[in-house]
Amino acid sequence: MLSRKMLAVHDISCVGRCSLTVALPIISAVGIECSVLPTAVLSTHTGGFTGFTYRDLTEDIMPIEDHWKSLGLTFDGFYTGFLGSYEQIDLVKTLISDLSNDNTTIYVDPVMGDVGKLYSIFDSEFPKGMCKLCEKADVLMPNLTELCFMLGLEYKEGPYTWDYIDQIFREAEVFGLKKIVITGVSFEEGKIGAVFKDYETGATGQVMRDAIEGYYHGTGDVFGSALVGALESDISLNDSVRIAVDFTVGSIKRTHESGADVRYGVDFEEGLGEYNRQVRIASEGISFEIVDSDLQVARVAGMAARIWSEFWADKLKEGQTEYMVNKFQSFQPIKDSIDKGYEYYILKSGGQDIGYTGFNFEEDRVFISKIYLDRDYRGLGLSAQILDLIRVRALSEGIHKAYLTVKRDNLQAINAYKRAGFIVSGQADTDIGNGYEMNDYILEWSF
């Protein structure tokens, strides 16, 4: 894929991680060319600092655009953030119209408030002006405060219900968006994150994480920049939101644990390598290598020994993991199951073996025996690609159902499968020998 050219239109605070000082490094970290157009220059951002300097750059916007037009420049994406006046909103609308191409995507973060209040520099009419820019957006990235002000709705403190958020999604249809991601949403005490809707497909979702005590400046810009970088890398909305949430939460955690002065923003720099890795994996996806040789069986057995000993270490009785690997997932049992009709696939990313899956066709459904990933590749949305492989193989055999078993206290896996469309259909208690028993739920999936 050719590198896309992004223009970030924000202010620049010389000290304090926010706006352009986070947008440029984060978006560039995933290989996207990021040009900048500063709307103002501040000595520091305005949160927690006094005596800061502020130079408005409104008068520079059109001369800069005129020079770019003379060079024949267009941009594949625009990412707008803090705009300090109605005039800047109008100028940015013109900029977008003049410098877009047929494939341009418009990302708007309507920075103007938080926690139910507008920032002090904005009057009560400013949200109406920002609405005009939002009508040009393909992807809108407000917090709930900003969205309520623009829609003329009363801001309510959380926790929220999904019905309330769904109502907000419907109200936001007025902007004619393709996608919306709303930050600062909580459905239960101690959890906070982002919700999203793809208006083109109707798909909705949420990504919630543990709340961290305190208020951290610049996190909206960190999140928005990470989201833009992921979406511009051709990653799904669901995975892009997850990556952006985890990147932001990781930045907050590092800052909280270090005891750093929160006025200077969050420590996002240390997480750029992991952010790049997650974007690369999600963008490239995984490849599947069918297991049909003894050497490949040995590779699967090696992964099973490694992954099982790590994953099940604190979940099974002493000695049970080693017993189960030897009985079910060592070389000979895997080879025997393949001889009986099971299909095994090695999962690969970047040329490396990262996991495996195994399944068997029965009369009218598929039994999914194994889906295992190395620790560093869990939680990256890869299970959806594995399930899609199984679904496609099943449909090729005229089968529309699958099932699997999950340990009844493995709530994380159960919830993940439920999100993928599985339902709990029963229980199974299986004596596997040597005094061990597996107590599982049976989960079924129709497609």
Predicted features, each with a name:
Residues C14-V15, T204-G218:
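Short pre-catalytic strand/loop immediately N-terminal to key active-site residues, enriched for Gly-Thr
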Residues Y403-K407, K418, I423-Y441:
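Conserved catalytic-core motifs of GNAT/GCN5-like acyltransferases
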Residues I121-T204:
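Conserved phosphate/ATP/ADP-binding segment of small-molecule kinases
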Residues L2-V108, M112-S120, E269-R280:
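Conserved N-terminal subdomain of the carbohydrate kinase-like
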Residues Y216, Q352, D374-D388, L395-E397, ...:
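Conserved glycine-rich acetyl-CoA-binding loop
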Residues G285-D376, L387-R393, E397, S425-T430, ...:
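Acetyl-CoA-dependent GNAT
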Residues N238-G285:
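Charged C-terminal helix
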Residues G214-L237:
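Short, small-residue alpha-helix embedded
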